[in-house]
Curated annotation (Swiss-Prot):
GO terms for biological process: translation. This is Large ribosomal subunit protein bL33. One of its GO terms (cellular component) is cytosolic large ribosomal subunit. It comes from Bartonella quintana (strain Toulouse). Belongs to the bacterial ribosomal protein bL33 family. The gene is rpmG.
Length: 55
């Protein structure tokens, strides 16, 4: 069987609240770590979320 192109990743808040989003990314086209600016409801503002592995 072929290796799947998309993998699940966890986007963890850099505000150290422990809040995270789970999303998918194409591991063949996006080889770098993903980071997005999204809403963190714990601090009630948009912050940077960085990619970590799902444990």
């Amino acid at each position: 069987m072929a290796k799947a192109a998309t993998i699940k990743i966890k986007l963890l808040s850099t505000a150290d609240t422990g809040f995270f989003y789970v999303t998918k990314k194409n591991s063949r086209t996006m080889t770098n770590k993903m980071s997005k600016r999204k809403y963190d409801p714990v601090v009630k503002r948009h912050v940077e979320f960085k990619e970590t592995k799902i444990k």
